Structure formats: C-alpha cells, structure tokens
C-alpha cells in the first residue's frame, strides 16, 4: 500500500467517503485517489513523490498555473494585515471594480465564498425581482449543491449515477423545470406551459459538468429572446467559464448579454471566492438596499480578494487568451489525431482554455447530455489509469472538462501527446479495435 492509499484508508475513518467532494473519491474511474502534497506551474506532486502534468487545475481556477509567484506574494502580503475582518475593505471595492471593468453586462457585483452561494443567491434575487417561483435549468448542467439545483444535475451527481439527490423535498423540486441543453424548442414548450411563473433561466454557457459541451450557434441568443418574450431573467453561470474561455467570459465569446452572471474559480486565484452581479436595477433588490436577503461572514475575505486581484490583473496581459486557446486546441486536435491513427472512436470539443474528449462511435458533434451518457465508460477508465501511469493527471470522471493553464509549455504539450499516442496504441490491442 502506497502513501496515497494509506491516507485514503485513514481519511475514510473520519471523512464521509474519505473526501470532501465526491468526484475526488475516484468512483468514476475506480481505484484510490491521489493525495496531493504540492503543486507548481503545470505540475502536481502526490504524497508518494510522483509528478504529474495537471489538466484539472483545481477544477479550473489555476489558469496561470499552480503557485504563481504574483498570486503567492499577494497572499503573503495580505496575511501580514490579518486574515478576516468581517467588515468592508478597499480590496473588495477594487475587486468589484475589476470585475465590472472586465464583464460589460455587470453593473454591480456582490462577493460570496463559493460558486454554490453565487448561484443560490442569484436565483433568490431573480425570484424576488420577478415575484415568480419557478426556475428553468438544463439536464446535465450543474450549478452547485443548493436544493433547487440538484435536479437532473451534472458533474458529481452524474458520476455517482444520481440525476438528483435524496434529501430534497418534492415541494422544492417542483419549482425547478428542466429543459434539454441546446434545444430551444424544449425551452419554449416549458415557457408556454408556465407563461407567468418562470423567474429565470440558469445555464452553463459551455456545459462543463457533462464534460465540455459548447452551445450550438444561436442557442444562447435564443434563450435571451425567450426570456425577453416571457419576462424572465437570464442567468449565465460563469463559475467555470468566467475568464476561462475569454476575457469577458463565455458571454463575451458568444455575444450574449445576461441579466445576471455568477462567477467563481478563476476570480479567486485558487482561494474560495464566488460572486454574482448584473444590472444595477436588479442588484439593488439585494439587502441592504432591497428586500432580498443575502449575507456571509467571509464574503469579500481580504486574503481571497488579494489572490483574486493578482490573478485578474495578470489575465489582462495582451495575447494571453489567444495563446491559451492555441495550447488547448493543440491538445484536443492532437488527441483526435492519435485516436484516428489507432482506430480509437473519439470525439473532441474545446473552447478557450477548456477541452473535452468522448469515447464514442457517434460521428455527430457532441451537443447533448444524451450523447454524453452513451459514451464508452470502460474505454475512459482504461485511458484514465494508463495516462496516470504515464504521468498525466486528468479529471477522474468522464463528466468533467479538462483545463489548460499558461504554465503548460511546449514540453508539457509534447509529453502529453506522446503519452496519449502510447496509451491509444495499448487500447487498440486491449480492446481489439
């Protein structure tokens, strides 16, 4: 038994399942999870001293790479002044100004401590502003673990084989309507059934919790039009995509203007941060200026704000996003070329600094939750563990996107694609493809 395995056994005695977030338990791929001791640049290092090229990036935030010197120094400087005040600081004002400057649809923003808090609060605000109870989400999209959102959710819920969760009363779930991602007709039919009851649509603009499914042309714009037609708000959940796929998020990349936006991950620089913001007229409904209550002891935490500001400022470097997109494209297209070489049925997707790969014989572009659930999980599990043995760390679930960082250089890309080629050669023999 190696040290990671021993730590996992020890953890299971005191932590449910041995982990503090379900996907980390490796249930989707089998075996024991790696316990990580440190990370630097494009690499993570486990408790046994093994080094891996990392394509998880703490599930998205580490867009500059791990342990970036500017972010680390910003945190060290902030710690000198104390860890938490529970009072306003100049740092949170600067952070709000930075977010508003980088996301044109946001006129005011409220800081929270997680993506779940951000989506939960944005939905409460939408309900309060419209005086309507129902929300509309999409099958396979994940927006955190708030009760109203764990209905046909993606990501960890899919990995566990549970489209929803026990512990959610039917009275809560009945207000959550579920449509088909990339299918405007399914959305319109729900609006026509409940024309005056839907407060908002909430969606991931790139569905990153059923792997990586981009919107088809016109889908986001169609949702904007339906919200306008039926008097609902459009909430774009950019917790994952915000500053990951483009400077102004996926909404800037695809040219759609939401009423509210949720953020997280990248804006924290690796620290626990979430945010929700939008039009001033809507945001004024949040306490203390309005009747919709939201609060948090650690909201706007000075250490988190310092880390986030350092990362956001670094992201303004000219040419950064085109360079990140080019790296991501090389990995995705390189994987596809290797798969074709070895007759491995594989489909790929990529946008900005996110990518997805799917072991499927479906020749159509990957656009739906239904397609993802039909992918070959046996192939994925084999590929996952073989890549791990080659020193490449991918998300341990077929329902999670991959992430690159600016720290992934020529050597890392070349080593990764060499490993992919080697593993696909193994798979061709192992599965008689």
Curated annotation (Swiss-Prot):
Keywords: Cytoplasm, Isomerase, Porphyrin biosynthesis, Pyridoxal phosphate. This is Glutamate-1-semialdehyde 2,1-aminomutase. The modification N6-(pyridoxal phosphate)lysine is found at residue 265. The gene is hemL. The keyword Cell division does not apply. It comes from the Bacteria. It is found in: Cytoplasm. InterPro entries: 4pyrrol_synth_GluAld_NH2Trfase, Aminotrans_3, Aminotrans_3_PPA_site, PyrdxlP-dep_Trfase, PyrdxlP-dep_Trfase_major, PyrdxlP-dep_Trfase_small. GO terms for biological process: protoporphyrinogen IX biosynthetic process. CDD domains: OAT_like (cd00610). Pathway: Porphyrin-containing compound metabolism; protoporphyrin-IX biosynthesis; 5-aminolevulinate from L-glutamyl-tRNA(Glu): step 2/2.
